[in-house]
Amino acid sequence: MELHIKNLCKSFDGSPVLENVSFTAGPGVTCVMAPSGAGKTTLLRILLGLERPDSGNFTGNVRWAAVFQEDRLLEHLDAMGNLRFVLGAALDETAAGALLTELGLGDTAGKPVREFSGGMKRRLALARALLAPSAALALDEPFTGLDEENRARCQALLRRAGEEKPVLLVTHDPADAQALDAAVVKL
């Protein structure tokens, strides 16, 4: 499955944020790179249907799973409770337990998310996206707050996910693209 983005434009209050953005993303990891404030998050919001472009189009009507800059977790639930609440009947609890363990969250049963560190919350948000039944992943700065070891774990999981579906990741860090062996789109 391929996503085709063609001539996307978006302005806010007359100031252009995206100007004629075009690229194709197939299975694998594609990193959209630009400095802070250059429209990376806006691009993801358009693809996710949360914003409307001023002009241009994209094809690939897909079900997305996303990691936003804010983790959007339920603070009073534990890790598995967050996954159950969001994914419902689609959740494979055996796979979820294995993924939580792989992400270093296997020993958090019963611990409310409000007691998690920022990096733990980030890994849980990534687990939620990876477990969701989706055709593509949209990830907004998914490695923020992760130490080197956990960053490498998450990168390995995203490379693996990219073998089956498009993984669109926005970042300003070229090291992310290199570690993910990603195609790069510069805004």
Put a short name on every predicted segment.
Residues 112-116:
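Conserved ABC ATPase signature
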Residues 137-141:
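Catalytic Walker B motif of ABC-type/P-loop ATPase nucleotide-binding domains
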Residues 148-150:
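Helix N-cap at the start of a conserved alpha-helix in ABC-type nucleotide-binding domains
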